């Protein structure tokens, strides 16, 4: 058991690619937590996708032992948090487990939107914040400009900001000294009933469900019976341990310590991030504030390209859900694509990561339908239900009203790109809330429909700003809207996989776009193929694929016009009969390309 006066719990918060995981590597190296043989880049990022994309997806923790210059040995608990907006709830719960934060900012890039969002979460949790300016060895580094941004935009005193290079190791000893002397020790009562916050959970093939937690009060011991306050579920603790970053079993965790337990838990859904864990026989009175169950906000359907892979896909989704309780899936069927699953995600990055993991780790070939958001639909009987699948949307005469989710977005961009960003936001039905300037940077606040953002808003934002704009957002309630179900017909047959829910103002343009794309993708047939976009009985767009035409009059010599007319009439009847009995063979690649929606 460790005395709380020598414990420091801290998180590293930063925008994507500002050097957060690299700094964690240098701290682990400086504290000799791993041998040279075991040390690798982004040691806390366990997934290949995390390393390749340079992002952190799952919150990770490591206990480091540091002998400070004052002769005291400190125990540092580092929580490496995700930086992307999709995982912002994970960040807020990780920050609730700490007393301080290292605010890492790229000294050449400056403050960005997600830096802002995460530092405000740290301030809400009463964190002591140490500002660290990374990449100070670069020629483009401008520490003074970034310090003034920190003071003007965030409102923190940047006079004590540390200049470091996580890549070369410059200034790492200063960071460690700042952690032990500038960040506070945890406060708690070891004699009070056990109270611990659940930071993360995942599935381990040997240990079962592993819970990462921080003890606030009391002592957590092996063999203790513990209860989850949100679900009331009771378990007996089998193992208690810490990450150094390798697993190390211990007898107990006391006030301020961060570690893991296993307790024979079978379902990851029982372990909700942010939940309070307490001793069953002596429960704490009040749970940690701010707990909420994470709900998917973006949905799409995943179908295996090879129908025989359906069971393999079901198993793969089940395994991913063991590590990610915010991800949901339900079976569905499509006449065009066969059997698949309707999946729910926290955002577009979450969707991309899950799809990439399915394809890479489980060797699956998948078709994904267009992403959709959750609409609240009130029917004429005044019954409200949530709809995210176009096939579940009632007919227009059955609908009394519809509400769609809107987001509050914060965009930071150099002022020379402001005009393009404003035009982009307005084209997405956005409403400007605020605009302020700090030096050459514009801080823009907008409200936007989530349905407009999930398609390609982030890509368009980066494109019009040459990659300089940064975005942070959160769902900010529901707003009444007018939507339509756009149905795609091929030779008068509806294709359910291409149906989508769209705002009424975008119906014609989106319908025309899909029809034009399908015209290029569907092979020509022996007969004419009509591709139509419809809303109810009204056709809003149409494209026609011309048939192949065999020259049946080639063998007719001379000027026998009646013979030619007879052959042409016979060909016309044959094509008419062929059209009535023939199905248009739409290749799988056509669905995939048609569903890659771009404005």
Swiss-Prot record:
Q: Where in the cell is it found?
A: Cell inner membrane
- Its chief place of residence is membrane
Biological process terms from the Gene Ontology for this record are: positive regulation of translation
Record's keyword annotation contains Hydrolase: yes
What is the membrane topology noted in the UniProt record heading this document?
Peripheral membrane protein
Name the enzyme's class: hydrolase
Give the E.C. number(s): 3.6.5.n1
* Binding locations of GTP: 17-22, 134-137
- What's a single GO CC term here? plasma membrane
Q: Which UniProt keywords apply?
A: Cell inner membrane, Cell membrane, GTP-binding, Hydrolase, Membrane, Nucleotide-binding, Protein biosynthesis
Among Pfam families, the record links this protein to: EFG_C, EFG_III, GTP_EFTU, GTP_EFTU_D2, LepA_C
Keyword Cytoplasm recorded: no
InterPro entries cross-referenced by the UniProt entry: EF-4, EFG_II, EFG_III/V, EFG_V-like, EFTu-like_2, G_TR_CS, LepA_C_sf, LepA_CTD
Name residues in a coiled coil. none
**Where does the tr-type G domain start and stop, copy by copy?**
5-187
The UniProt GO MF terms for this protein read:
GTP binding; GTPase activity; guanosine tetraphosphate binding; ribosome binding; translation elongation factor activity
* Function in brief: Required for accurate and efficient protein synthesis under certain stress conditions. May act as a fidelity factor of the translation reaction, by catalyzing a one-codon backward translocation of tRNAs on improperly translocated ribosomes. Back-translocation proceeds from a post-translocation (POST) complex to a pre-translocation (PRE) complex, thus giving elongation factor G a second chance to translocate the tRNAs correctly. Binds to ribosomes in a GTP-dependent manner.
Family in the record? Belongs to the TRAFAC class translation factor GTPase superfamily. Classic translation factor GTPase family. LepA subfamily.
PANTHER family referenced in this protein's UniProt entry, alphabetically: TRANSLATION FACTOR GUF1 HOMOLOG, CHLOROPLASTIC, TRANSLATION FACTOR GUF1-RELATED
- Please state what the protein is called: Elongation factor 4
- Gene name of this polypeptide: lepA
């Amino acid at each position: 058991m460790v005395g709380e006066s020598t414990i420091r719990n801290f998180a590293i918060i930063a925008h994507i690619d500002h050097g957060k995981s690299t700094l964690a590597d240098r701290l682990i190296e400086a504290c000799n937590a791993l041998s040279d043989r075991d040390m690798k880049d982004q040691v806390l990022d366990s997934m290949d996708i995390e390393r390749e994309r340079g992002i952190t997806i799952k919150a990770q923790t490591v206990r480091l032992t540091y002998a400070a210059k004052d002769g005291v040995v400190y125990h540092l608990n580092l929580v490496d948090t995700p930086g992307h907006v999709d995982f912002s709830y994970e960040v807020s719960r990780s920050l609730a487990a700490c007393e301080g934060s290292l605010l890492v900012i790229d000294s050449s890039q400056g403050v960005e939107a997600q830096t802002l969002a995460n530092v405000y979460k740290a301030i809400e949790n009463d964190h002591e914040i140490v500002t660290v300016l990374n990449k100070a060895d670069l020629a483009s580094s401008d520490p003074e400009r970034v310090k003034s941004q920190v003071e003007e935009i965030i409102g923190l005193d940047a006079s004590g900001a540390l200049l470091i290079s996580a890549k070369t190791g410059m200034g790492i000893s200063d960071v460690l000294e700042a952690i032990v002397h500038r960040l506070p020790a945890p406060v708690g009562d070891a004699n009070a009933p056990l109270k611990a916050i659940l930071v993360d959970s995942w599935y381990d093939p040997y240990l079962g469900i592993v819970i990462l937690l921080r003890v606030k009060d009391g002592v957590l011991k092996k063999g203790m019976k513990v209860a989850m306050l949100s679900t009331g579920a009771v378990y007996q603790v089998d193992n208690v341990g810490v990450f150094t970053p390798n697993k190390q079993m211990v007898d107990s965790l006391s006030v301020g310590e961060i570690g893991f337990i296993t307790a024979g838990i079978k379902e990851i859904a029982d372990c909700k991030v942010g939940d309070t864990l307490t001793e069953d026989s002596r429960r704490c009175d009040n749970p940690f504030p701010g707990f909420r169950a994470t709900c998917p906000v973006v949905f799409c359907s995943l179908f295996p390209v090879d129908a025989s892979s359906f069971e393999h896909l079901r198993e793969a989704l089940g395994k991913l859900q063991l590590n990610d309780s915010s991800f949901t899936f339900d079976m569905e069927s499509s006449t065009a694509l066969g059997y698949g699953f309707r999946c729910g995600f926290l955002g577009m990055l979450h969707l991309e990561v899950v799809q990439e993991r399915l394809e890479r780790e489980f060797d699956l070939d998948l078709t994904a339908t267009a992403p959709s958001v959750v609409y609240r639909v009130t029917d004429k009987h005044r019954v409200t239900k949530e709809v995210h699948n176009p096939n579940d949307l009632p007919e227009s005469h059955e609908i009394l009203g519809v509400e769609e989710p809107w987001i509050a977005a914060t965009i930071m961009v150099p002022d020379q790109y402001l005009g393009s960003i404003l035009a982009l936001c307005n084209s997405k039905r956005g409403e400007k809330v605020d605009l302020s300037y700090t030096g050459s940077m514009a801080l823009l606040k907008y409200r936007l429909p989530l349905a407009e953002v999930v398609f390609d808003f982030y890509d368009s934002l980066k494109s019009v700003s040459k990659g300089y704009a940064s975005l942070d957002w959160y769902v900010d309630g529901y707003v009444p809207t007018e939507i339509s179900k756009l149905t795609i017909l091929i030779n008068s047959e509806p294709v359910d996989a291409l149906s989508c829910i769209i705002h009424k103002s975008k119906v014609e343009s989106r319908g025309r776009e899909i029809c034009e794309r399908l015209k290029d993708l569907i092979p020509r047939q022996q007969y004419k193929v009509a591709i139509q976009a419809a809303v109810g009985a009204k056709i809003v767009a149409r494209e026609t694929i011309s048939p192949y035409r065999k020259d049946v009059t080639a063998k007719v010599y001379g000027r026998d016009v009646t013979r030619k007319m007879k052959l042409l009439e016979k060909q016309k009847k044959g094509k008419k009969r062929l059209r009535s009995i023939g199905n248009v063979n739409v290749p799988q690649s056509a669905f995939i390309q048609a569903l890659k929606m771009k404005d």
